[in-house]
Structures are given as structure tokens and as C-alpha cells.
């Protein structure tokens, strides 16, 4: 039998992998509802996730897709993306993808069907959402945007308000772009102080 890199695998390793996938599938199916309830109780997940048919979604989890990851990919998910309580990760890879998919499907008419569709493309790596979506989808802070563009007004209050807004937006992993064209040039007259900028 050949694996992904074309090396010969002994039959017992192939069988062992098949058993591992089957065992992982059972764990995933049992784990998803527990994970959702625990995440809601810890105020990490949106309470609306409990309204999904969790058994139906759990049945769609494909444990074999965990084997698509290389070490670095899985470690990156663990270090940066998986939800945690006091540094203890509470997400498994397939639960992570389903949580993101559920968050994206919250307002859909047939949310379970849409969540399954989103899960299929995410977990198969056919499409990968941006970092803010992976961080925040399905959570209590469902900010999914990757980038914010703002215009900074030409007055002191407006400039400091723009800085405050940037800090609040950056908190949830969105990129920032500011249009400063309305701010007067260096050396221009400041009416309120009769000075120069």
C-alpha cells in the first residue's frame, strides 16, 4: 500500500491507521456536542450554536481529514487557533472546522446543511477562510473581517478617535488601513491655535 509520499507501508501500519481513523471518528462524533456545550459555558462560543442539530453535524465530521495535516500545520492550529480554557485546548481539528462552519451558517435558513457545506470545503482544504474568520467564527466575538479601511478627520478629537478605533479593531485580528488625505499638510495653519501643524 502507498501513503501520501509514495513509501511502502506494511499491512499492519495501514490497518493501524484505518483503526485509528475509525476510533477518532467515534471520538469526534461524541466530542462535538460536549465541546459546543463546554465552549458556551466558558463564554467562548455563541449560545446560538446550541440550537444546531449537533448530532447531525457530528455525524458529518471526517476524522480521516486529520491526516491531511503535516506537523507544522497541526502545531500552528494548536498554538494559534484552537480555543482554550486556561491554556488547555478544547478543540480537536474537525471540531474546529465545524465550529467555524457553524458560525458562518448561523443566519442561514437551513443552517445545518450550510454548516455541513462550509465544513466540507474547509476541512478538505479546498478553501480556507482568513485568520479573523478562523479565530472568531462561532465565538461570542464573531468579527470575521480581514481588513478595515478608515478615513482620519482633520481635527485632534478625530485623530485620537481614529487611533482608538484602530486599537479596538486590531484586538480581533483584522488588518488596518487609514486614509490620512483629509489631514492638513505639515506646516499648514491651525486656526484654533494660530500655529502650524
What is each stretch, according to the model?
Residues 1-197:
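Extended catalytic cores of very large enzyme megasubunits
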